[in-house]
């Protein structure tokens, strides 16, 4: 039976004649139906078989794995009468390895196979390369290195599959030196197009597009769809979206048609560019081509419309061919959250009968980006109760972000404990999130412990540590971390200097502040932003060096249009009791923010600090009759896992009388302490 038509005819004839199919014929039909996408028919043939052998079980399990139904494949595998061999194990192992959320099952099965070697279930090179690919997916280089050792020990490290898998794994894990060693050290006969494509992808991840192109052009056999798709994706991931589109056009000019991966890569580029017009054109081509049945293509279409802010088109596309596609659903959730529509996002989220980590993460990030920490923590409780997904580092980062926003350490410590118990990979993003959370919760010691225990660091992690120390008055530690950072070869950015200048401002360290400000501009070629200027102006103002603040203001372009900088300079004038400058700043500031009530209050207080009560009354009088926006500051306390929020002179709390009574006693005690100290 070489084709589907022959298989159908043979099957129909056997049904009409009432004859029983042989085991060989049944196995052929199962394979034929599964290859043709007829999974239900394949299962029916399998269920009707009177006699099954190991080939029968392998055929039907492979069919379910092919269609990403590892749950059903596992049930068949674990059934009492299932006959298994190495192919059966490898088939299910590959299914677990490529299915999101089943990575732990793959690791368990690999361990089981290792234990069953005495039962003739030998681990072969396919088994190990499958696990190497899983290591790449998890970016777990430690596990990947162990598997590399197994391949070397068994003499399978030079096979074509092993070479391409190892290149891919080390590339994904950021070990580019090892990538080059494997590629350059392999025999030419084992470096096939798969390995060369893996090398192209590795160069792209490293950001070296020129070398990727060099490999591509030097090997004419790479003029295929896979190689072109790799380059298109490589340009895109390095921020060269326009070049990626040109490469996609060149691909067709070279006689190659776009496939599902091409459409997916192009749609990702259009999402980044927010190109609605071209997105619609590609959408039309997808409909004509029929590639919309691919989940990545259909979710890519939805994502383009979401990124372009056209939720009406996105909703239509999702309903037409994204229904049941969790990647499409996650794009919709991100689209809704980007427009602040978390009610719609939550409604879609709740309507999903099945949720994977991608969907959960989209919801977590949606709430976090809109600064709704309570909702993040509530969602985290629902995630734990769900018990169908194991939290990954991105989920943990989202919850830790919520803890940081509320300075709420307890959930953060629970996540820390969970990560230690489960042995989850502490990547740089997760370590940075822990450092940030502990710092913002006031436990700088814990933050430093985690920072010191990290083997891999980057600029973002150093920034979190420097900012944490600066915020809590440990300016010497901030400066030391900066020295360690630069000595380690990490390049500071504008956030680094923002943290350093904040440390100087808190302690009134004028000389150090000037040194870092000058270094930022001259040594690192970083243009100062509003935050850097306000730090320096505050620093000069508190040090009673108003002349320096004036000199700095004179060198800032378009300063009269920046309300934040003018507000900082107003404070500096107030501290130095310079009412003439307060008057000048008042005129400029109210032109920009004449509807902001907080600015009127700030100006009135500036006059009051200099004893100019007449000017203060004038400002207060101007406020009358105007519809001004006044934003009240607030404080909160967490007691028994419940947040209590208060604004100035708040009387809304149900225990208001008791709270004010306690505040009265505390204030009285503090006054007595002040008198004793004086």
UniProtKB/Swiss-Prot annotation:
The keyword Heme does not apply. Keywords: Repeat. GO terms for molecular function: RNA binding. PPR repeats lie at residues 22-56, 57-84, 85-116, 124-158, 159-190, 192-222, 224-258, 259-293, 294-324, 325-359, 360-390, 392-426, 427-457, 458-492, 493-528, 529-563. Residues 565-640 are annotated as: Type E motif. GO terms for biological process: RNA modification. NCBIfam families: PPR. This is Putative pentatricopeptide repeat-containing protein At3g18840. PANTHER family: PENTATRICOPEPTIDE REPEAT-CONTAINING PROTEIN (PTHR47926:SF387). The keyword Repeat applies. Belongs to the PPR family. PCMP-E subfamily. Pfam families: E_motif (PF20431), PPR (PF01535), PPR_2 (PF13041). It comes from Arabidopsis thaliana. Residues 641-671 are annotated as: Type E(+) motif.
């Amino acid at each position: 039976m070489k084709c589907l038509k022959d298989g159908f005819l043979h099957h129909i004839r056997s049904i009409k004649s009432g004859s029983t199919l042989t085991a060989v014929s049944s196995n052929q039909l199962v394979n034929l139906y599964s290859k043709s996408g007829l999974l239900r028919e394949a299962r029916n043939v399998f269920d009707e078989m009177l006699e099954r052998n190991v080939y029968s079980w392998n055929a039907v399990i492979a069919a379910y794995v092919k269609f990403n139904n590892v749950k059903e494949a596992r049930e068949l595998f674990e059934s009492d009468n299932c006959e298994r061999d190495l192919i059966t194990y490898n088939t299910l192992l590959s299914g677990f390895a490529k299915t999101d959320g089943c990575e732990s099952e793959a690791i368990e099965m690999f361990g089981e196979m290792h234990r069953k070697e005495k039962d003739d279930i030998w681990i072969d090179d396919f088994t190990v390369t499958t696990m190497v690919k899983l290591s790449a997916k998890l970016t777990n280089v430690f596990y990947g290195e162990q598997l590399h050792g197994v391949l070397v020990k068994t003499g399978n490290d030079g096979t074509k599959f092993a070479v391409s898998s190892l290149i891919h794994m080390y590339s994904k894990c950021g070990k580019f030196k090892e990538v080059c060693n494997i590629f350059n050290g392999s025999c030419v006969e084992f470096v096939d197009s798969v390995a060369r494509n893996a090398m192209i992808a590795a160069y792209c991840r490293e950001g070296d597009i020129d070398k990727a192109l060099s490999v591509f052009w030097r090997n004419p056999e790479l003029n295929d769809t896979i190689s072109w798709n790799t380059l298109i994706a490589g340009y895109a991931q390095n921020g060269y979206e326009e070049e990626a589109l040109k490469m996609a056009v060149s691909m067709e000019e070279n006689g190659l048609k776009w496939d599902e991966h091409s459409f997916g890569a192009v749609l990702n580029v259009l999402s980044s560019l927010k190109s609605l017009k071209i997105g619609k054109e590609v959408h039309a081509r997808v409909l004509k081509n029929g590639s919309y049945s691919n989940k990545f293509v259909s979710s890519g279409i939805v994502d383009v419309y979401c990124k372009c802010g056209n939720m009406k088109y996105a909703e239509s596309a999702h309903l037409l061919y994204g229904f049941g596609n969790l990647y499409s659903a996650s794009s919709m959730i991100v689209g809704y959250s980007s427009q602040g529509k978390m009610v719609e996002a939550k409604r879609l989220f709740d309507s999903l009968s099945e949720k994977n980590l991608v969907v959960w993460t989209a919801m977590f990030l949606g709430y976090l980006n809109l600064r709704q920490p309570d909702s993040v923590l509530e969602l985290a409780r629902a995630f734990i109760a769900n018990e169908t997904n194991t939290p990954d580092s991105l989920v943990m980062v989202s919850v830790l972000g919520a803890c940081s926003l509320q300075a709420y350490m307890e959930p953060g410590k629970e996540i820390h404990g969970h990560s230690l118990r489960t042995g989850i990979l502490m990547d740089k993003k997760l370590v940075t999130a822990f450092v940030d959370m502990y710092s913002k919760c006031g436990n700088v010691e814990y933050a430093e412990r985690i920072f010191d225990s990290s083997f891999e660091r980057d600029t973002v992690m150093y920034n979190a540590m420097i900012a944490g120390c600066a915020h809590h008055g440990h300016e010497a530690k901030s400066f030391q971390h900066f020295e360690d950072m630069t000595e380690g070869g990490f390049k500071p950015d504008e956030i680094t200097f923002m943290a350093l200048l904040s440390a100087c401002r808190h302690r009134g360290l004028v000389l150090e502040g000037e040194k870092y400000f000058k270094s930022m501009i001259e040594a690192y070629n970083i243009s100062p932003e509003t935050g850097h200027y306000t730090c320096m102006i505050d620093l000069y103002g508190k040090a009673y060096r108003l002349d320096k603040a004036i000199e700095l203001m004179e060198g800032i372009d378009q300063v009269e249009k920046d309300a934040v900088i003018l507000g900082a300079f107003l404070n500096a004038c107030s501290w130095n009791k310079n009412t003439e400058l307060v008057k000048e700043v008042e005129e400029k500031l109210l032109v920009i923010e004449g509807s902001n009530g907080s600015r009127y209050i700030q100006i009135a207080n500036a006059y009051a600090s200099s004893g100019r009560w007449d000017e203060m009354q004038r400002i207060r009088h101007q406020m009358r009759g105007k519809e001004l926006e006044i934003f009240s500051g607030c404080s909160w306390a967490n007691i028994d896992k419940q947040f209590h929020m208060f604004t100035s002179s708040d009387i809304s709390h149900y225990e208001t009388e008791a709270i004010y009574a306690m505040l009265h006693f505390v204030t009285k005690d503090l006054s007595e302490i002040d008198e004793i100290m004086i």
